[in-house]
């Protein structure tokens, strides 16, 4: 990261702030906006879907739940490159192709397993009698989920959202096949600058990604701290 403060690394290592102004171009601003939108969308959609899957598999013992659990774990075995190429073949020519939504969908599937396992383990630690008590008291299942189960795992949900956000903003495997000029995230611009031997520019973009991800992690830590009070 220090190379962005050097005149021309590694030829001229004089310290300068010139690059900070030069690299703040419309292309970089668009890439930053795309990365934030991608991160927020993946965090929202991914957290919702993984929460639904974990609730089904951790709290209900039936054949459908076992299938959902198996598929959720198997998603980890799919490489990002394979996922990206599969999406190109499946969605090319559709309205979804070339939009940020296809990047969000790919990101959710790519990073699904780890957040799923986090919430799955948290839900299994809760008493297995909660559903029986709720049924006895006449509490609707959805109310039990939103008023009891999910609030008990609020810190885990925040960590899941942060994981989706951070992972989606730094990945390049699936995004390399699915992004267009208007949806290209900063991570791909880092690769482009690096290939052009523009190391200062690549370092600057990497620093921007790091700063955004630190904010996401700080927000998750704040939520977890508030939950513990």
Question: What is each stretch, according to the model?
Answer:
Residues 1, 28, 32, 36, ...:
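Hydrophobic alpha-helical elements at and bordering transmembrane segments
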Residues 46-49, 72-83, 96-120, 140-143, ...:
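Faces of alpha-helical transmembrane segments in polytopic inner-membrane proteins
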Residues 26-59, 64-67:
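Transmembrane alpha-helix signature in integral membrane proteins
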């Amino acid at each position: 990261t220090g190379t962005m403060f050097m005149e021309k690394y590694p030829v001229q290592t004089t310290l300068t702030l010139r690059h900070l102004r030069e690299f703040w171009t419309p292309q970089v601003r668009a890439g930053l906006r795309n990365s934030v939108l991608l991160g927020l969308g993946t965090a929202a959609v991914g957290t919702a879907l993984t929460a639904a899957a974990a609730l089904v598999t951790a709290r209900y013992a039936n054949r459908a739940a076992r299938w959902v659990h198996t598929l959720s774990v198997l998603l980890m075995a799919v490489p990002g490159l394979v996922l990206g190429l599969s999406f190109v073949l499946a969605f090319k020519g559709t309205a979804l192709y070339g939009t940020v939504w296809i990047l969000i969908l790919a990101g959710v599937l790519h990073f699904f397993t780890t957040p799923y396992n986090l919430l799955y383990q948290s839900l299994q630690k809760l008493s297995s009698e909660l559903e029986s008590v709720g049924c006895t008291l006449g509490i609707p299942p959805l109310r039990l989920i939103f008023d009891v189960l999910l609030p008990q795992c609020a810190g885990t949900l925040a960590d899941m959202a942060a994981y989706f956000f951070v992972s989606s903003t730094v990945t390049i495997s699936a995004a390399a096949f699915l992004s267009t000029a208007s949806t290209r995230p900063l991570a791909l611009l880092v690769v482009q600058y690096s290939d052009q031997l523009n190391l200062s520019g690549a370092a600057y973009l990497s620093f921007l990604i790091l700063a955004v991800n630190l904010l996401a992690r700080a927000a998750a830590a704040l939520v977890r701290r508030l939950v513990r009070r």
